């Protein structure tokens, strides 16, 4: 992206559980995103975001999350499936920023220990993404039986995921560029 600033597309890990295999997925996505030309990224692990039980939205903003979402041109959300849904803490974090999400691209990565690869969690997140103003891409990445996809040390065991991730990231980057241009050039006031 000569002559313009890089896109910023962080990867949000949407769980705080101990022993979470989705941490390996998030690290892989962050690693592959960092290889893309003209893109900056960072892994945002919600386990490291201070989430008090009071006015969590303000506390998260103070922790810099809001600033990162404001700067972001798009997002990747890595969401493990828990009983057909996503973690309450992910919802808590997503609800902490609303105006920062408007007209920004989002790609969702589903993770499960079972055969469906987080398909149900992705389906649950789609209406939430729309409601908070994010624009979903049409590619998803599903990590089925994630415990068989990564070794305990995080090494990827199934290289076919790299092709899927590449397709996903190309679509996300295209959408992030397009939406950034729209935000910068077209006023909706």
Where are these regions (language model features)?
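His-Asp phosphorelay/catalytic-motif detector in bacterial-type signaling
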Residues: 102-103
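Mobile beta-alpha loop/short-helix "lid" or hinge segments that flank ligand
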Residues: 42-52, 99, 132-152
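N-terminal beta1-alpha1-beta2 submodule of the flavodoxin-like/Rossmannoid cofactor-binding fold
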Residues: 1-97, 156-189
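Short, glycine-/small-residue-rich phosphate/pyrophosphate-handling segment
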Residues: 106-146, 159-163
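Repeat-unit-sized solenoid/scaffold elements
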Residues: 77-84, 109-119, 145-153, 181-185
